[in-house]
């Protein structure tokens, strides 16, 4: 009987805090790697198992001379210093080896400490090892008490669904003791749910020589498991435990018993799984070679030509071989892992890495037992040394995975006579890794796409480890990377009739026999082959997205699984959105042309191209289509293929792609036909498609500015700093800006920074310099009017210029203004230059933002999904009532840029929807206190600079804002420029993390459910009304609606929209909210949707703020006198102050509960009049008709004045 071996680790005991890395169950062991053995031959083994690197010469240090007073002080201090070096003990041999390991293997001591701490937290507690040992002893005694006999009907259902059932099974008690297998045996159990696998071998007496045929072995195995389970339930030792059946690896032929102990101290995190196996000598060795058939067509009542060879059942054969060879394979693993802490820890690291990427799930999963076997293989090949550290083990495995090809086969079996047979066996599988017996392919069920994905992830891990500028630990081990966040599109088919139709009409008989009629792998093969052929280079990978099968009570019937399928498509951004699929020439290759025409059906047409060739081709769109339309080309192709080849209806297919692009589309309420412009605008256009129009207009304006004659100073550079220039403006920018009564009206202004040539004539006084700048701008405006016929208007912020319906705000930047802002004169008359908030804001806007804006524009050019991802993210934050004053827009842009810059996925993000889901994961799981988000644009930051900044961040964390963002252009302000302590605050960050987790829960639930469709945008992009104390409704006719798609308010129903053009650069509501926060942020928090929100939500501070306090002259703001000479802040008084500040915007105030009640009672809140509901109810119908008739004949001017006067009257 196997026992769990207690592992004594050096260092302090594991703490009780929750583990930092995800833990998981598994069936295997540990691992390690040579930091310098990336596919190279292993060098001569040293004492630590890796070649000593050649030491690099140290650069000579520059000597600096201290100023004379300082040097004298230093000498005086040294005079009294004692020489402690003589009292320091030299380092021990173990300490020297540890220091050398840190220098040679790890990036830094931090990475080593993180790995060490994680391994300590993964250590199995003693209470679990003791319980498992005691349970195994008890179970061994139990199996010896079992009695032989005929298995009759019991209360339990046999956990197997087969067409033809056997009868008369005679049970024989085990002749061999139960054994621990997998991770429990090799000492690599992983939590948080610790799963202990136990194998009980069925004796040969239960089986006959012909039981290998037609699923008889599988039925006897299931009957044996059922009998043992029934006996355990009636035994007092297990009667209180919880019993359930489940399918191991989503394989319906592999039922296992899942037992949850009743003992309270282990029941929460411990589960035992019972496997039934058979002796390897039960059947002849050649029965289960891949080319043999062990399920006859007659079993399924199919006819088969006797002269034709029977189809091979290689996958079914591998399923049986798994049981037969389990003991031999486990013995090999135990020999390799037991007593080797380095191998065990290495495998634990690999398990965490694999589980975080969800590549080990389901029928097609790349299980951790494969990784354990691969460690043994590398040890056999002398690529891994027995003394390799755990880090070396993991790194070597990643490196070998990335650089070896298993499609031709590798084997653990002795080399003699295996080469020819190995190549033959490999031809029956996508991936081939033979076990020690040389009969079982450990990767029999792993499809090529999953294997290639594992290789890509392994290569990424090695690249991250090689990047000396990066702390790769969180990216490799800590970040959870669900598979749905790694794919761009998802195909989901859950309709039962569609599944059966595909299996009946399109599954070949050979596939049915090979997988024993299990539908899931057949569907996977049918769909993958079809989509690979149709999409070709448009996709980089097609991956199955599986959910682990759920356990069921032992009294219930075994469920039928595999009746739904979900595939993830990883797109190639370079080819995915091509509008043309060109076939072979009809003259040169008539057969190929006919095949192309047959494959594509009616979509294929004969076309002549500009080069004169005439070929068959399929056109999916035009080159002028908007990017959002082009992102649906792959969806269009997949839907056509499924309909044309598999006869599936579109209503039975869920293709998840670009559902969230809706949020930045133009509102259907706004009619583009009313916009007077020469541009071709479509009603279904969006913010992304409209951005190039603004950029082209800006480019023309920049050329005109450079071409202006007779300017006093030359224009050196012109930079746009508006979000639209970076494709990051979520509101559609239409050419509707107009000049009205000498004022420019526009919903958006595009900010432009102009740098002038050097001159020594600028004044040395700040106000004079700014006056001269204004005069210069006026001259630029006059010349634009005279030479380019452009209208302009001067404001306090700069020069407004109207061009082609777009409004630009020109600002002049001059270094002298920045210097004057920093200038301070001390009491002694000494002039010094000190940073202050105003100077930092000016430096950011005039000098840093233009560079960052250009870098983000370049990022969008290389990753076309970057801009749309920002648009979705900004819309989501706005709908959660987080405006620019709470969450800076640049923080969103830089966080998304961080996602696209960091290499935490093998492939770049091709779909904005996927980018948004990754951003949600970042927001949901980031450690805001410990993470500094670095954006090294153009790799202009050196390794030393990054290290210094990270050291400063860790050592002086309190001087940085809660959300620390740093770009390589920030200079001395790195980490403190884009956010502040209050924008966003730590409380807001926690709030956003909760919102992101909730959004991810909705997304995951919809993806994992067979019945639910993917979440609708209205579910994600509508904030909650919970948690707010008051809601101030604003007059909808004074607050213009946003031009983007309106997904509704969390408080009230839809209202008639208005699209009034405000004065350019004016946002009165944002200004009022800023005033409210400035005056009353100590007493209340204010929230509103900056994208056309009509409500202002208020949340009071804690009650202690409103408690009576002693009278103090300095603390009387918003206070009212109360008893005993004390003062207190009264909420009702604050509300009256809010009304005064809101002035004409205020309509009514209520609580969220009142608004909900009105919605339920269908009493829609009055938006234009602050009238009580009963006022309208008291009116008779005839009176209402008379009022309506009178309103129709009223003059429009009179009606307008009435609408304005009523709310003002109610305020008084």
Curated annotation (Swiss-Prot):
Family, as annotated: Belongs to the NRAP family.
Task of the protein: Part of the small subunit (SSU) processome, first precursor of the small eukaryotic ribosomal subunit. During the assembly of the SSU processome in the nucleolus, many ribosome biogenesis factors, an RNA chaperone and ribosomal proteins associate with the nascent pre-rRNA and work in concert to generate RNA folding, modifications, rearrangements and cleavage as well as targeted degradation of pre-ribosomal RNA by the RNA exosome.
Assembly and oligomerization: Part of the small subunit (SSU) processome, composed of more than 70 proteins and the RNA chaperone small nucleolar RNA (snoRNA) U3.
Cellular component per GO, a single term: CURI complex
Subcellular location(s) of the protein: Nucleus, Nucleolus; Chromosome
Domain of life assignment: Eukaryota
Keywords for this protein: Chromosome, Nucleus, RNA-binding
GO BP of this protein: ribosomal small subunit biogenesis; rRNA processing; tRNA export from nucleus
Protein name as annotated: Nucleolar protein 6
One GO MF term: RNA binding
Keyword RNA-binding: yes
Compositionally biased residues, Basic residues: 1197-1212
UniProt region (Disordered), positions on chain: 1-72, 1156-1212
Keyword Nucleus annotated: yes
Species this chain originates from: Drosophila persimilis (Fruit fly)
InterPro entries referenced in this protein's UniProt entry, alphabetically: NOL6/Upt22, Nrap_D1, Nrap_D2, Nrap_D3, Nrap_D4, Nrap_D5, Nrap_D6
């Amino acid at each position: 009987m196997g026992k769990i071996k207690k592992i004594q680790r050096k260092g302090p005991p594991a703490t009780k805090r929750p583990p930092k890395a995800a833990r998981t169950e598994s069936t295997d062991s540990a691992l390690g790697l040579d930091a310098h053995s990336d596919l190279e031959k292993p060098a001569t083994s040293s004492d630590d198992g890796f070649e000593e690197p050649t030491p690099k010469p140290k650069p000579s240090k520059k000597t600096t001379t201290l100023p004379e007073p300082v040097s004298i002080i230093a000498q005086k201090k040294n005079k009294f210093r004692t020489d402690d070096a003589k009292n320091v003990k030299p380092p021990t041999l173990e300490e020297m080896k540890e220091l050398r390991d840190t220098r040679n293997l790890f990036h830094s001591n931090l990475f080593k400490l993180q790995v060490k701490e994680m391994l300590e937290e993964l250590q199995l507690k003693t209470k679990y090892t003791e319980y498992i040992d005691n349970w195994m002893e008890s179970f061994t005694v139990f199996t010896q008490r079992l009695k032989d006999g005929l298995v009759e009907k019991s209360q339990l259902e046999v956990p197997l669904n087969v067409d033809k059932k056997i009868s008369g099974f005679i049970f024989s008690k085990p002749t061999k003791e139960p054994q621990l297998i997998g991770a429990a045996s090799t000492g690599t159990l992983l939590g948080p749910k610790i799963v202990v696998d136990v194998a009980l071998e069925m004796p040969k007496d239960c089986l006959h020589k012909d039981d290998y045929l037609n699923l008889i072995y599988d039925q006897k195995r299931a009957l044996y498991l059922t009998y043992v389970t029934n006996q355990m339930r009636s035994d007092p030792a297990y009667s209180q435990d919880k019993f359930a059946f489940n399918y191991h690896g989503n394989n319906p032929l592999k039922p296992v018993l899942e037992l949850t102990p009743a003992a309270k101290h282990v029941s929460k995190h411990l589960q035992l799984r019972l496997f039934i196996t058979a002796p390897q000598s039960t059947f002849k060795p050649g029965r289960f070679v891949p080319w043999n058939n062990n399920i006859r067509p007659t079993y399924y009542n199919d006819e088969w030509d006797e002269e034709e060879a029977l189809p091979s059942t290689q996958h079914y054969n591998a399923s049986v071989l798994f049981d037969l060879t389990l003991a031999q394979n486990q013995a090999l693993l135990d020999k390799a892992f037991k007593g080797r802490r380095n191998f065990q820890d290495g495998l634990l690291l690999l398990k965490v890495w694999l589980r975080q990427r969800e590549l080990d799930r389901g029928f097609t999963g790349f299980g951790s037992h494969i990784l354990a076997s691969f460690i043994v293989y590398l040890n056999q090949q002398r690529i891994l040394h027995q003394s390799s550290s755990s880090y070396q083990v993991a790194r070597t495995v990643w490196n070998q995975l990335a650089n070896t090809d298993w499609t031709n086969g590798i084997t653990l079996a002795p080399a003699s006579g295996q080469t020819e047979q190995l190549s033959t066996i490999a031809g029956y599988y996508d991936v081939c890794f033979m076990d020690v017996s040389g009969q079982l392919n450990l990767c029999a069920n792993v499809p090529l796409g999953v294997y290639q994905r594992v290789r890509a992830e392994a290569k990424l891990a090695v690249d991250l480890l090689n990047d000396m500028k990066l702390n790769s630990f969180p990216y490799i081990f800590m970040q959870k990377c669900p598979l749905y966040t790694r794919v761009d599109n998802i195909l989901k088919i859950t309709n039962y009739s569609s599944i059966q139709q595909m299996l009946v009409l399109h599954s070949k008989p050979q596939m049915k026999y090979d997988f024993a009629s299990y539908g899931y792998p057949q569907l996977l093969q049918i769909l993958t082959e079809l989509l690979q052929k149709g999409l070709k280079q448009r996709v980089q990978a097609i991956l199955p997205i599986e959910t682990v099968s759920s356990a069921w009570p032992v009294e219930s019937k075994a469920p039928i699984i595999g009746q739904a399928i979900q595939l993830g498509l990883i797109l190639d951004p370079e080819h995915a959105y091509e509008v043309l699929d060109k076939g072979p020439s009809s003259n040169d290759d008539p057969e190929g042309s006919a095949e192309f025409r047959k494959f594509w059906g009616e979509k294929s047409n004969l076309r002549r191209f500009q080069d004169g060739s005439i070929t068959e081709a399929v056109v999916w769109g035009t080159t002028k289509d908007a990017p959002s339309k082009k992102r649906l080309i792959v969806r269009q192709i997949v839907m056509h293929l499924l309909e044309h080849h598999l006869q599936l209806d579109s209503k039975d297919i869920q293709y998840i792609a670009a559902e969230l692009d809706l949020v930045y589309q133009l509102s259907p309420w706004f009619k583009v036909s009313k916009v007077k412009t020469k541009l071709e605008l479509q009603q279904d256009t969006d913010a992304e498609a409209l951005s190039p129009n603004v950029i082209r207009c800006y480019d023309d304006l920049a050329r005109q500015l450079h071409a202006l004659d007779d300017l006093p100073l030359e224009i050196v550079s012109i930079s746009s700093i508006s979000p639209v220039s970076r494709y990051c403006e979520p509101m559609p920018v239409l050419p509707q800006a107009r000049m009205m009564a000498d004022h420019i009206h526009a919903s958006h202004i595009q900010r432009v920074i102009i740098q002038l040539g050097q001159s020594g004539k600028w004044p040395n006084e700040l106000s004079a310099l700014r006056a001269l700048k204004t005069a210069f701008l006026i001259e630029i405006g006059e010349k634009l009017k005279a030479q380019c016929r452009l209208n302009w208007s001067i404001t306090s912020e700069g020069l407004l210029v109207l061009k082609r319906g777009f409004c630009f705000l020109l600002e002049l930047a001059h270094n002298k203004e920045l210097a004057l802002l920093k200038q301070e004169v001390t009491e002694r008359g000494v002039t010094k230059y000190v940073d202050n908030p105003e100077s930092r804001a000016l430096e950011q806007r005039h000098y840093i933002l233009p560079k960052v804006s250009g870098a983000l524009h370049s990022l969008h050019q290389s990753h076309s999904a970057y801009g749309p991802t920002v648009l979705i993210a900004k819309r989501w934050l706005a709908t959660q009532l987080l405006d620019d004053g709470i969450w800076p827009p640049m923080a969103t842009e830089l966080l998304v840029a961080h996602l696209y810059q960091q290499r935490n996925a093998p492939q770049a993000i091709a779909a904005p929807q996927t980018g948004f889901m990754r951003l949600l994961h970042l927001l949901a799981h980031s450690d805001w206190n410990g993470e500094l988000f670095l954006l090294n644009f153009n790799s202009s930051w050196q390794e030393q600079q990054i290290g210094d900044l990270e050291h400063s961040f860790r050592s002086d964390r309190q001087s940085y804002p809660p959300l620390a963002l740093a770009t390589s252009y920030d200079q001395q302000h790195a980490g403190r420029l884009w956010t502040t302590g209050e924008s966003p605050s730590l409380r807001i960050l926690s709030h956003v993390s909760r919102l992101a987790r909730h959004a991810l829960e909705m997304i995951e639930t919809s993806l994992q459910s067979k019945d639910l469709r993917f979440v609708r945008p209205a579910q994600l992009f509508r904030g909650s009304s919970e948690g707010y104390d008051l809601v101030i409704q604003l007059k909808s006719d004074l607050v213009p609606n946003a031009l983007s798609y309106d997904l509704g308010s969390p408080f009230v129903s839809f209202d008639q929209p208005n699209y009034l053009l405000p004065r350019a650069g004016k946002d009165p509501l944002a200004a009022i909210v800023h005033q409210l926060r400035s005056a009353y942020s100590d007493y209340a928090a204010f929230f509103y949707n900056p994208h056309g929100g009509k409500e202002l939500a208020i949340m009071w501070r804690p009650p202690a703020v409103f408690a009576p306090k002693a009278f103090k002259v300095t603390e009387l703001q918003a206070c009212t006198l109360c008893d005993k000479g004390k003062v207190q802040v009264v909420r009702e008084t604050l509300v009256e102050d809010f009304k005064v500040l809101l002035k004409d915007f205020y309509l009514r105030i209520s609580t969220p509960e009142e608004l909900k009640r009105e919605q339920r009672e269908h009493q829609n809140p009055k938006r234009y009049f602050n009238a009580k509901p009963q006022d309208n109810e008291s009116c008779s119908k005839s009176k209402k008709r008379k009022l309506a008739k009178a309103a129709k004949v009223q003059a429009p001017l009179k009606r307008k004045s009435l609408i304005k006067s009523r709310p003002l009257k109610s305020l008084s």
